[in-house]
């Protein structure tokens, strides 16, 4: 499978995350239930792990469902951020998880990319997808919608819209 679009989306978000810029915006640290920059990075790491599991399952011939529920639980995201040592650790984890996803996705052939997976995607309290999607379609959503959305969000949190 061609991963150039996905790779470009990861490159953009990683460049933003690693650029020190003028300093964080007022919402970078957040409070309570508001997402912070670290929460966005942790979300992307967890989501990558879920996508890696889905891609690997197709490569192994036993397609498993994709559900992003674990990637949106704020307490879990904050615990991951603490465990990885904050922003720097999260950036390194995102580099690794995205590299693994890109490598595995690059091994998919057309038939594997067309494999339908039961998919559930929740955004806040809204269910956006709750139906089977071809694996390639799920990765296209990641490249064209999900990563760019979080790139904008991260830019705002870091004061770099």
Identify the meaning behind each predicted range.
Residues 22, 26, 64, 110-114:
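Secondary-structure boundary/capping residues
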Residues 1-8, 14-34:
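An N-terminal domain-cap segment
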Residues 27-74, 117-161:
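Short, contiguous alpha-helical
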């Amino acid at each position: 499978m061609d991963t150039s679009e996905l790779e470009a989306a990861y490159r953009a978000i990683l460049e933003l995350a690693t650029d020190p810029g003028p300093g964080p915006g007022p919402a970078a640290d957040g409070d309570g239930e508001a997402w912070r920059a670290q929460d966005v990075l942790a979300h992307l790491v967890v989501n990558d792990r879920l996508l890696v599991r889905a891609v690997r399952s197709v490569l192994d011939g036993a397609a498993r469902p994709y559900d992003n529920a674990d990637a949106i639980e704020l307490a879990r995201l904050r615990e991951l951020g603490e465990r990885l040592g904050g922003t720097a650790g999260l950036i390194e984890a995102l580099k690794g998880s995205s590299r693994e996803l890109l490598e595995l996705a690059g091994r998919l052939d057309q038939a594997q990319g067309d494999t339908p997976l039961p998919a559930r995607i929740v955004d806040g309290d809204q269910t956006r997808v709750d139906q089977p999607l071809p694996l390639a379609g799920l990765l296209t959503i990641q490249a064209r919608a999900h990563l760019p959305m979080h790139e904008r969000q991260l830019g705002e949190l870091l004061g770099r819209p």
